Amino acid sequence: MKTLSMKHRVGIVWLQNELRTDDNPLLCKAAAECQQLIVLYCANPKWFDANRYGLRSIGERRWRFIWESLTNLDALLQQLGQQLLVLPQSPLHAIAELITAHNVDALYYAEHPGVYERTYAELLKRRYPLLQHHAVCSQSLWEQQQLPFTLADLPDSFSKFRRQLEQNDLRDAIPAPLSSPRQLPPPPAGLLAVPRQPLPVVTAPQHPQFVGGSHAAYEQVQAYFASGAASTYKETRNALDSWSDSTKFSAWLADGSLSVRRLHQQLLNYEQQQGANESTYWIFFELMWREYFHWYGRRHGRSLFAFNGIRQQRPQTSFYAGRWQQWCSGTTPFPIVNACMNQLNATGYLSNRGRQLVASCFVHELQLDWRYGAAFFEQQLIDYDVSSNWGNWQYLAGVGADPRGHRRFDLDKQTRQYDPNGDFIARWHGKVEATLDWVDAADWPIHPPK
């Protein structure tokens, strides 16, 4: 029973990449402090408009996955006495209207690694200085104050980052995941009765395995660890086209329907029951990569999207519309790249090895501006994560967190190693008649797949 002694009268929990009730510190904090609560998600119309690269921030497959996660979250919230309010507005407009209509006095949101998400939060602070703003850590393994360095002193490579964490035994210091609140404060009267604009239509077919939401995330985590595949992960992780050869947790981590701390707890449980080995460590190793890019995004802000990256060194690449179109549509002279791009366009997913190969081709063989590749991934990938995506593209373009810089993959060698019988190329129709097309900009604009 909520009483008048509670800290806030009406609070807004502004969800972004925390689409869960389990281990959600935003909901837990608001539940303890508010008499009434609005649980808000903003489907920003800008996501669905063409950006500077002629692409959308969210493609059809990722929007379907997010929509499924939102639907599942609403069902979970209803079990706790709440409902999810999804508005097709920018956070500034949506939150402003709710503050006025419901006398909101507290706002809860995540400490997000994305510079644009943080900009919205800063603008809200300036516009509503009397509002109590609660920025909460919800997307990382560690709290910022636990790191053995300041954000300004974030190591300039993953190897240095990992060594500092391991030298300080910080794995044992990862906070335990929180349980879901048993009950949430009710929404203000009349909140859901106001007519709203419709959300963007879901047009992509449902993926047979990547289904959004905490329920599907839980099933994938349980199935993966029950299969024993974690004990051989290091040997299988570079396969191009098998569901069980890698964890596939990334999509649910990306929209926050799966907590990274909950996942880490499940990994620890597996190690205690089945034994830790190099493969189970490598799963944690991948979580540390994700963690590094989380803080990398927080540290470097807008430089994450800059052509010269964080190293102030301009790449010797440009933009060629014909090559760009070939890469997007999987019609380059490189069959392994074509197969990967066809898989990405058809499913919204691509293996880690596949991502490295197509990015290397984009930068080296095709000599294209890496930002266009990163933007295409942003549109197409179901598991898009702002810091990991743009940070990894910088890494491969030689303008990011790679001391060796400008890494290039030998596509013929990679094909022999990872597709020796040509099964992957055949399955995804990688062999096409294509040559590099030296065209001028007259054929622009080109519309890549959605």
Regions found by a protein language model. Name each.
Residues 65, 69, 213-216, 332, ...:
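Soluble or luminal CAZymes and related metallo-dependent hydrolases
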Residues 245-437:
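Active-site-proximal binding-pocket segments
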Residues 31, 215-218, 341, 374:
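Residues within alpha-helical segments
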Residues 2-173, 342, 388, 392:
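Trp/Phe/Arg-rich N-terminal binding region typifying the photolyase-homology
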